[in-house]
Amino acid sequence: MDRGAPSRERIAELAGGEPLLAVSDLRAGYGKMEILHGVDLMLAAGRSLCMIGPNGAGKSTVLHSIYGFTRITSGSVRIGGEDVTRLSPNEKLRRSGIAYVLQDNSSFPDMTVEENLWMGGYLLDQPWQAKEAAERVFEKYPRLANRRSQPARVLSGGERRLLEISRALVMEPRVLLVDEPSIGLEPRYIEMVFEMLVELQRGAGKAIVMVEQNAKKGLQFADVGYVLVAGSVARVGSGADLLQDPEIGRLYLGG
């Protein structure tokens, strides 16, 4: 693991191959307040990255900025070498293959599970495309298929999380941004959610960028870990290396 501000060469090395997602010297924030101060991030397809750090470090703001929810003052976001920095969130989802699973409960409680999945395809040209995508989800996740006609409000917290991630898959993204996937979940549902993410990364080749308050679980999952402090990347390393670092353990892992 690198100590001190990591070099771009080290960040590129940890990407795990040709970067699918490349964030370069990103400065961004909300209104007149700059939250991110020159963030670099790279990740190849089929790889995972978890950001940890203290509250207010800017972790979720990195996801917001990649997706287009912040005011970017300088730097760039590239997908497969194409500059997508100024694209709207809808354009990033439809054209560039970036999907975002929000931290807060984002399912529609009075819609059925099936209808929630259809909503994930709101940018598709034809309604039947979303319906076909929903059927593919049901084939892969029988737990949701068994609930397809029930309103989302009757789902457990873990099932809602599966639904939210599945809805993001309807547009067949290449990059999946996931904000706090374990928050508020019982341990058995945390395992279920992370099993799904592992399959999406290793089986479907998605690049997954995650913020996770359960730092130990996030680093166990991720190929790469970034530590953010005060809007900057302070440390980088493999997830395994960060887990073994005594200082990281003391500050973020309860060790």
Feature locations, PLM:
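ABC-family P-loop ATPase nucleotide-binding domain
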Residues: 1-27
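ABC ATPase C-loop
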Residues: 168-169
